[in-house]
């Protein structure tokens, strides 16, 4: 959803200005049903962002993008199809499917020449979610190249309800590993969410994980694109500064810092209600 803005800031395009001009009359209207992405612009912006990144890549490492299925804007299926295929066309090494079951996402890419060459994986938070996904992908004779198993302590959107504290990453990983073994499927598993130390990582690797995913710990790294002020918020945050809420328009619970601007906006909206 932010790719047009990213393109404007990085490549001096004017996609956001163009869209704002078209829907200027609707800016103050809470009903956004008429607002649509220009899918041609979404494709162009994605190809610019991904293509320039791939051109700048050095070494043998791979570059992946995370693509959320859950969109609150109109025409979500068509938008998702454009985003996925534009990334493949621009040469991305791999795509991680997130924020949704993605039951139709492989089909949206099936006609792309790189569908079987690029690394395609999915984030799940339960064995049930993976089972549903695999039922769809096996019809295309294309298994995922990896599965990220995200636990209840992850930052950002969670694949759980507000009862997230009742779940445990290690248990979910074990359940999925057992299921894949039973089905004789060899798919690399990558635990994520709540892996805070090297010891945490080693424990999962010793149990057979192909890798681990760590994100929040790297928000304060030099390579992270966040402003220094935001990095400092992460660095100094304590447990009481972290909250799980339902302010996201996706409908998923979300873990965030209490200082995030999204919460200030949410509080302001509530205070303005009659």
Residues of each region from the PLM?
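Conserved active-site-proximal phosphate/metal-binding subdomains
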Residues: 154-169, 173, 177-190, 196-274
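Residues that cap or flank secondary-structure elements
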Residues: 75, 192-193
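Active-site entrance/lid segments in N-terminal catalytic domains of soluble metabolic enzymes
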Residues: 1-183
């Amino acid at each position: 959803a932010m790719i047009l803005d990213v393109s404007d800031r990085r490549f001096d395009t004017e996609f956001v200005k163009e869209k704002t001009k078209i829907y200027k009359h609707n800016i103050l209207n809470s009903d956004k049903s008429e607002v649509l992405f220009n899918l041609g612009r979404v494709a162009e912006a994605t190809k610019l962002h991904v293509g320039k990144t791939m051109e700048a890549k050095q070494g043998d490492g791979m570059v992946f993008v995370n693509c959320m299925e859950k969109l609150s804007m109109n025409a979500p299926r068509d938008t998702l199809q454009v985003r996925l295929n534009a990334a493949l066309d621009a040469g991305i090494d791999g795509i991680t499917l997130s924020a949704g079951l993605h039951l139709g996402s492989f089909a949206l890419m099936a006609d792309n020449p790189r569908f079987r060459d690029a690394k395609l994986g999915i984030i799940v938070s339960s064995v049930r979610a993976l089972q549903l996904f695999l039922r769809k992908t096996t019809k295309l004779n294309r298994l995922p190249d990896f599965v990220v198993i995200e636990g209840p302590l992850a930052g950002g959107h969670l694949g759980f309800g507000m009862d997230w504290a009742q779940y445990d990453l290690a248990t979910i990983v074990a359940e999925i590993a057992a299921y894949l073994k039973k089905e004789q499927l060899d798919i690399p598993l990558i635990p994520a969410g709540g892996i805070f130390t090297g010891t945490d990582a080693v424990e999962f690797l010793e149990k057979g994980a192909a890798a681990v995913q760590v994100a929040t710990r790297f928000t304060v790294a030099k390579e992270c694109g966040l402003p220094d002020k935001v990095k400092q918020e992460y660095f100094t945050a304590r447990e009481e500064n972290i909250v799980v809420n339902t302010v996201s328009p996706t409908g998923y619970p979300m873990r965030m810092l209490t200082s995030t601007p999204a919460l200030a906006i949410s509080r302001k909206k509530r205070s303005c209600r009659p």
